[in-house]
Amino acid sequence: MDAIRGEVSDKIPIRLVIGIASRALFDLDESHRVFVDEGVEAYHAYQVARENEVLQPGVAFALVRKLLALNQRIGEAGRVEIILLSRNSSDTGLRVFNSIRHHKLDITRAAFTGGASPYRYVGAFDAHLFLSADPSDVRQALAAGC
């Protein structure tokens, strides 16, 4: 294997696919508090009203930025792919994608589960790793063999 280029001898490219929860990528503590304290309807209204407010980086943001930078450093796009796996619905997830665009993160694929744990989508995206700020989601992903 050529460690620099990330290829095996028959030239099959190796790609690292990482699924990340929106709460790990961005600081969603305040909106999560609204969800827990006030319920789904209030959370929906909160996110939609703030869809153009940029979210601040979360606990895994710096790691994601560095992983995505490997694509430019190696000289070939697509060696590392980050996939957003989110409990948001597609409409409340708009704020997350607006923030992804603002921070210039090369994240183009996502699954919005509408409240369900996103770990179920790790395998569907052939992700090698799942990053989440929710310990329960991580445990479920590990138990499922993800």
Residue positions per predicted region:
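HAD-like aspartate-dependent phosphatase fold
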Residues: 1-146
